[in-house]
């Protein structure tokens, strides 16, 4: 899959690209429990990953993933909201232990079981609030087949470089729909490199330099004692309750992600000179947004387009862009506009408009109508 002058057309779904990119980027094991609409990922992983484990449930899957991560093997799983809700405590554990992993969350219509075969973008707020205390999880969101390849690589490498769980957000349509795609567009992916401790002195598992990222040592090595703990701890990994050193270490977990946020910031901004309106979207709805903007421009309207690919922590860059427009239209497939509220709070300014739906994909015409409205 290299760039050539000759097209290599294939009929492919996003799941296959995600699995292939995961392996090439350095993921070593897939651990999963079958759930719609993530079953293609489960199936392809069984064919492609060096190791694949079928867990009896989602809680077990995340616990096994933590075990593999502690050995220096990057684990990947995929689930939907019912499974993700069961994983939350273990994701918190992995975040506190600073164990890298990738959780692919394929959104479907809720609440609860909802409609497993209907798409949605209803898990935005859940992902944002996954970690108790407001600690951010790097979260990427796929908007097309290019992203299935490129953002998966970024997710794996961000997890390893920052020693953190990472969420790769998608939806039923994006990972189950077969589309015509030119494989020659795919860039080469090199495996991620783990930053291992190479000192001769005693190893302190949570000691860091100015990067705020501790060096890693796997449990399987025999030179140094290694501790992983989900309790509030000091640099040695020893439980310290609420001592200043332990609380400073917990605060570092948030600062670590924020310090390196620019390194995993990805978005598309198609700015049209003279436009006073911008359409913002993500995931599968981004395709409707792209078409809507193209059609509006063909009608002579000046409209810009912002596609968010890094959702969390919320990039300051998005506010910098949106603040330059007198009208902002945010399209997302959920009730009330979850990302819109996370961006602007409960009292959304009057010039910020939403286009929302549940149980169906948003149509370009709906976005066009809101752009043209005077409200």
Q: Where would I find each of the regions flagged by the language model?
A:
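Short amphipathic alpha-helical segments and helix-helix/interface helices
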Residues: 19, 91-92, 156, 293, ...
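Conserved thiamine diphosphate
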Residues: 118-172, 196-198, 370, 375
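Short loop/turn motifs at secondary-structure junctions
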Residues: 26, 135-136, 302, 324
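Flexible, low-complexity linker and terminal segments
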Residues: 2-14, 164-375
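Flexible loop/turn segments at secondary-structure boundaries
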Residues: 37-40, 62, 84-86, 110-112, ...
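Conserved beta-strand scaffold positions in the cores of enzyme catalytic domains, especially
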Residues: 52-54, 103, 139, 305, ...
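Short glycine-rich or small-residue beta-strand-to-loop segments that form or flank ligand, phosphate
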Residues: 28-31, 75-79, 138-142, 276-281, ...
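Thiamine diphosphate
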Residues: 1-129, 136, 153, 172, ...
